[in-house]
Structures are given as C-alpha cells and as structure tokens.
C-alpha cells in the first residue's frame, strides 16, 4: 500500500528502483494465468484512495458489488489511473451506476471517513500489501499459490 503515491501515479521502475522488476512481473503474469485472471502490462502504480471511496459508495447502490471486478480490470488489465475522477466516473457509469452521483461523491470526498477508518484498521493489523487475507490474527499477504490459501482456510476451519 502506497498512500503517498501522487495523483499521476508512479512508474514501477521508479517504485522498485535498483531492482530488476522483470522477474517479478513474469511471476505475477504466471500466477494470474494459473488463476485464470487477466493481467495486462502494468507500467505504473496509482493512488487508490478515490477508487476505495467509489467502492464504498457503490456498496450502497443497487448492483454496486460489480465495482470490484471493474476496478480490478481497470487497474490490473488496462493500467487505468484510479486516482483520476473522470476515469472512475466512467467505470461507475459503465456499470449503470449514476455517474453524476459518483462524481459528486468523489469530488466532495463523501466517503473519506470510511476510507480513513479502513486504512487505520489496516495499519493496526500490520497490513502493508494487497491482497491480504486476515482472520484470527493470522495473515496471508501478497500473491500466493493456491496451496498456501488452501492451508490457511483449512487451519481456520480447525480452530
């Protein structure tokens, strides 16, 4: 999680300066392909606070759950800047959510407190990356093989 990321984003080369990121990108593409998930050629990381606010709002709307898949595709498949209000409004409108209301919510920062609360909870739990699966003080962080997640779930069902 990089809350300090500027609105225009940060190139992955800058974020991981001094490290060879190509092996990491190949590994990520491999994991995504194995999971049957689309994954584009990402060049940047973007500040996702506004996308999180949009998702909080969408949760209050009929059919809003579709926002999660749409935001995933926008970010990981199409490399769309998720801190751009216009792009987020377009994503919401594409799901038949009220684009004007989405813009208003984003411009007025109507869900700022809810997003802040989520970030504070993440800090309290020591969550520093996504995805993170957390339950009963146990966490699985980052892109993990299926077997790791399976062991995590099996452990949870035994306790």
Regions found by a protein language model. Name each.
Residues 56, 60, 66, 70-159:
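C-terminal cap of thioredoxin/glutaredoxin-like
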Residues 1-78:
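Structural alpha/beta surface segment adjacent to cysteine/selenocysteine redox centers
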């Amino acid at each position: 999680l990089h809350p300090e990321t500027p609105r225009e984003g940060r190139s992955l080369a800058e974020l991981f300066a001094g490290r060879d990121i190509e092996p990491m990108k190949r590994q990520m593409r491999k994991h995504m392909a194995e999971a049957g998930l689309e994954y584009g050629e990402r060049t940047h990381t973007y500040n996702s606070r506004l996308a999180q606010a949009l998702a909080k709002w969408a949760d209050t709307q009929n059919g809003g759950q579709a926002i999660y898949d749409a935001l995933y595709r926008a970010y990981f498949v199409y490399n769309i800047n998720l801190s751009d209000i216009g792009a987020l409004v377009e994503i919401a409108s594409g799901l038949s959510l009220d684009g004007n209301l989405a813009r208003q919510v984003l411009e007025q920062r109507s869900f700022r407190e809810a997003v802040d609360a989520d970030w504070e909870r993440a800090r309290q739990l020591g969550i520093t990356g996504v995805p993170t699966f957390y339950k009963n003080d146990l966490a699985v962080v980052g892109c993990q093989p299926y077997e790791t997640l399976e062991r995590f779930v099996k452990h949870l069902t035994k306790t």
